[in-house]
Amino acid sequence: MQTIEVNGASPYEVTIGHNLFKDVAKSMSQLGANQAAIITQPVMGETAKKLVGAIEALGKEATIITVPDAEDGKNLNVAGDCWDVLGRKAFGRKDVIISLGGGAVTDLAGFVAACWMRGIAVIHVPTTLLSMVDAAVGGKTGINTSAGKNLVGAFHEPSGVFIDLDMIATLPDREKISGSAEIIKTGFIADTKILSLYEEDPEACFNVEGYLPELIARSVAVKARVVASDLREAGQREILNYGHTFGHAVELKEKYEWRHGNAVSVGMMFVAALARNRGLITDELYLRHKNILSSVGLPTTYPEGHFAELYQAMLRDKKNRDGRIRFVALIGAGKTIRIEDADRAELIAAYETLNKGGV
């Protein structure tokens, strides 16, 4: 078992290990909660029952709230249904929300907890690789609207995060591939050892008996360091958005049918092309993006003919300032910069590079 501290105004621990449900229940008890609401997805039904058993073994009560899968469960109507259950169960300020699922469930559960009685505790138990290294750590919560992804939300740090490596054995390859994008992202912005591990043996990077536990720990440690210094994304935390400006536009264009990691992968290729065209990074670093991402099955291209729609989506990105599209870019492996003055012609050139297969 490994523990990573996330410092800041409300410090908490990220626990990485095996068979952690008893630890989750113990954490809930230490918070003084009498009951928990486990917000989860249909596919996690039997797993949720096991977590209920661990909680009830300590004399506490647990209620399962099942929400629709993926982004279909991340909207105001679903949040309202969750609050209705909390009301019927007379949830008080000492009680706890537990997320058990992927990133969408993590985001939703955090938002539900942030709003109920102006904020109650939430514990995250992420079950996908993506949520383990992304949504579960950092305190961002949110739901989607027709205007875009995560435009309604709050900053609400969890009281604890439990990454149970046993969950990974049940994941289909497509989930492992998508989650790898966020791990690789942290390699490009901060911890280049991550990149070296993927280059050394991509297959071992999917394996709990191989490099995957180290990759998860390294990625979480990067995010923990960044968010500890900038909870509300006022400055340094923005580096975690590497690949996300174009990536979120792709998700919106594809009506959220693309997996988040796949969209971020294409987003990293887009901004790497933008940086290379400006002379900020070398051809070698640009190709390193393409080689590492493609080695694990992530997309590195996007079809032509959609720039106008993607451009409009980027213009609505919540990271923009004064009407300018803002990108996190690299000036070297592990070194970031902001691009805030890219004109339409530059963006078209980067997009055309993406269309041509990144050459």
UniProtKB/Swiss-Prot annotation:
CDD domains: DHQS (cd08195). It holds the Pfam family DHQ_synthase. Zn(2+) binds at E182, H244, H260. Its cofactor is NAD(+); Co(2+); Zn(2+). It catalyses: 7-phospho-2-dehydro-3-deoxy-D-arabino-heptonate = 3-dehydroquinate + phosphate. GO terms for molecular function: 3-dehydroquinate synthase activity; metal ion binding; nucleotide binding. This is 3-dehydroquinate synthase. It comes from Corynebacterium pseudotuberculosis (strain C231).
